[in-house]
Amino acid sequence: MPAILAKKLGMTQVFLEDGKVERVTVLEAGPCPVTGIRTIERDGYEAVQLAFGASKEKHLSKAELGHLKKAGAPPLRHVVEFRDEAGELQVGETVTVEAFEAGQRVKISGTSKGKGFQGTIKRHNFASGPKSHGSHNKRAPGSIGASAWPARVMKGIRGPGQMGNKRVTQKGLEIVQLDPQQNLMLVRGSVPGPRNGVVEVRTDA
C-alpha cells in the first residue's frame, strides 16, 4: 500500500473523457526518499519513514541533518512515518507519484485552515436567534443548562472556541490524473489545509 508526502498547490478544473468538467486539487507529490524503516523485531511496529520538502541546512538541527545524511538524502524539512506501509522499501530508495494509479482511492491527512476563536454559528452551524422585535441574542448560543438541575454545564456541550488548525483526514478521494514528469497528482474535490500546506497521501483500502 503506497504512501507519499505532498504539497497542496491549489485547485483547478479538468475535462474528463466524457466531456464533463471535474474540479480537482493539484498536489506536488514527492519525490520522497526513504529515511528509515521500522520493524516489529527491533521497534515493535512496522512503518516506513519518508522525507519531503527542500530546506536549507541552517533550518535543520545537527541531529536531523545527520539522520538524513545517513540515509543519503538531501536537507528536507518534513519527516513522517507511515504505519504498515513499508512493504519492500529499503532506506535510500525513493517513493514517487508513480507508486499510485489514476482512478485509485486515497485518504489525505493535513492540518485544516485556522479560523481563530469563533462562535457557535460559524463553528458548529447553530441556528441564529430572532433578528427583529428587539431581540438581543441574534448570535447567542442559547441555553447551556438549567440552574437548579443539572446546575452545571454537561460534558460535551458545544460552545464557542478555537476553530480549525486541527488534523483532518478526508477519505475516499479519487485520483483523476497523474503527471510523473512534474510529480503532480490531481485529486477529485478538496483537500484539507491551505495552499502550500503539506499533506499525507495514503491508499484508502
Task: Please name every model-derived segment.
Residues M1-A205:
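Extended basic (Lys/Arg/His-rich) segments that typically form rRNA-contacting surfaces
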